[in-house]
Regions:
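Glycine-rich loop(s) and the adjacent beta-strand/alpha-helix scaffold that form part
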Residues: 1-44
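C-terminal, flexible cofactor-proximal segment of oxidoreductases
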Residues: 21, 32-139
Length: 139
C-alpha cells in the first residue's frame, strides 16, 4: 500500500488500516495526502481528473484562507458506523487485492466515505464536494 513507504504523523507511525477513506482519495487523520486511485473497470484517468479538480479547489481554498494543512475527519454522527473493507468483495475481488485488504483503509456504507467505482455517480458527487464542509478541517 502506497509503495511500502512508512509514513508517520508527528513521529507516530501511520497504519492506513486504522483510517477511513473519504471519496476513496483521502484518509481520516492524515494531513495533506491525496491518494490518486482510478477505476478498476473504466478509464483510470476519468477518476484521476476528478480528483485533480478537487485537489485544485482545496489548494485554492487553502491559499485564499492562509491555511497550510487539511485533514478529513468523520463527522461525530458517523463515528459509530461499521467500518467495512476498502472494496466490497462482490464488486471487485482479485487475489492480489484480497491478500492485502487488511492493510487498506476502511470505508463506510455511505457514498462519500468509499471508493464507489461508479463514474456516473462520482462525476456529479465530486463536482459538488464542499471543500469547506464538515468533512474537512483546515489549519
Amino acid at each position: 500500500v502506497l509503495g511500502d513507504i512508512a509514513f508517520d504523523i508527528d513521529g507516530a507511525p501511520l497504519d492506513l488500516a486504522d483510517t477511513v477513506t473519504y471519496q476513496g482519495m483521502m484518509f481520516t487523520g492524515v494531513p495533506n495526502l491525496v491518494w490518486v486511485f482510478g477505476y478498476f473497470r473504466a478509464s483510470w484517468t476519468l477518476r484521476v481528473e476528478m480528483i485533480a479538480e478537487v485537489v485544485c479547489r482545496m489548494l485554492h481554498h487553502m491559499d485564499e484562507t492562509g491555511r497550510r494543512k487539511v485533514v478529513v475527519e468523520l463527522p461525530p454522527e458517523l463515528a459509530g458506523e461499521p467500518q467495512l473493507p476498502w472494496v466490497d468483495r462482490e464488486n471487485f475481488n482479485p487475489g492480489y487485492l484480497m491478500r492485502d485488504m487488511h492493510l487498506m483503509p476502511k470505508r463506510l456504507d455511505r457514498e462519500d466515505w468509499q471508493h464507489t467505482q461508479d463514474y456516473w455517480s462520482e462525476k456529479d458527487r465530486f463536482a459538488a464536494i464542499d471543500i469547506a464542509g464538515r468533512a474537512f478541517r483546515y489549519e
